């Protein structure tokens, strides 16, 4: 996952250092509980500091060194993105940060997004943006129609540079939909990024056993806090370091080559 090498302001470095200190305190069980976590810098401030992004760049967060973590939407190699974590770890907040950042950094002619969720009320704040295609409740007929139309668009999408983000909040729920919708969703996982459709999907880590056959579709996996080491290892494919030490709703980790990259979410 590439990072954009802009200069990082002192505030970003200080916040990153605070997260690092808290992680060290958590690792030392003899240390008393740390003070409450300070608020993360605002998304608008972070994006203003970064400056204009290339059309193909999707903002995901800020790394420990204060530099932005970006996904190149014109490079399909990473494939669909799976965001795993415990309940309350910030998976929905991650998707919402992506949606808000797109609205602030890109024209709707370049990037749009649609959301599939069990809780559409959580997405009211993004409905006013022209980048928003729709908020689709799991199990509703409109969700089936959206997945079908998106698959058709991807099939015929040969030359356009426009990208569509398919933000799915809870893989297990979508995996239980009707057979035709599930088949089209699987096709989007397999072929979507090469056709400018990017599925970004959340998973409750404790429920991974219910959808274990789906995991092979995700080469790129991002993790929020996972307290159970066995679950973390099963999802990461090896001994994922320190996922239990991540700050809920703020901090995430992904594998970058042979290393693990920690990053944090700005506040929306």
Give the residues covered by each predicted segment:
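P-loop NTPase catalytic phosphate-binding loop
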Residues: 2-25, 37-226, 230, 243-244, ...
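Intrinsically disordered or compositionally simple regulatory linkers and C-terminal tails
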Residues: 30-33, 43
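Beta-sheet ligand-binding and adhesion/scaffold domains
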Residues: 249-260
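Short, surface-exposed amphipathic charged segments that create phosphate/polyanion-binding patches used
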Residues: 235-242
């Amino acid at each position: 996952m590439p990072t954009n090498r802009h200069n990082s302001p002192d505030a970003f470095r200080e916040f990153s250092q605070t997260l690092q200190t808290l992680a060290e305190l958590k690792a030392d069980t003899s240390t008393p509980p740390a003070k409450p976590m300070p608020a993360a810098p605002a998304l608008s401030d972070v994006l203003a500091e970064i400056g204009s992004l290339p059309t193909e760049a999707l903002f995901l967060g800020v790394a420990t060194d204060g530099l932005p973590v970006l996904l190149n939407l014109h490079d399909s190699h990473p494939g669909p993105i799976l965001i795993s974590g415990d309940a309350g770890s910030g998976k929905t907040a991650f998707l919402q940060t992506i949606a808000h950042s797109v609205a602030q950094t890109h024209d709707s002619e370049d990037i749009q997004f649609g959301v599939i969720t069990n809780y559409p009320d959580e997405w009211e704040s993004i409905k006013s943006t022209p980048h928003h295609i729709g908020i689709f409740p799991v199990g509703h007929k409109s969700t089936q129609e959206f997945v079908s139309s998106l698959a058709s668009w991807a099939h015929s999408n040969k030359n356009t540079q426009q990208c569509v983000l398919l933000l799915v909040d809870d893989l297990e729920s979508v995996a239980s939909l009707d057979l035709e919708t599930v088949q089209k969703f699987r096709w989007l996982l397999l072929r979507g990024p090469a056709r400018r459709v990017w599925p970004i999907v959340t998973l409750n880590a404790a429920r991974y056993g219910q959808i274990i056959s789906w995991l092979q579709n995700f080469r790129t996996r991002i993790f929020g806090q996972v307290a159970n080491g066995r679950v973390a290892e099963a999802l990461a494919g090896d001994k994922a370091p320190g996922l239990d030490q991540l700050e809920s709703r703020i901090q995430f980790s992904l594998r970058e080559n042979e290393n693990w990259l920690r990053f944090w979410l700005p506040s929306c």
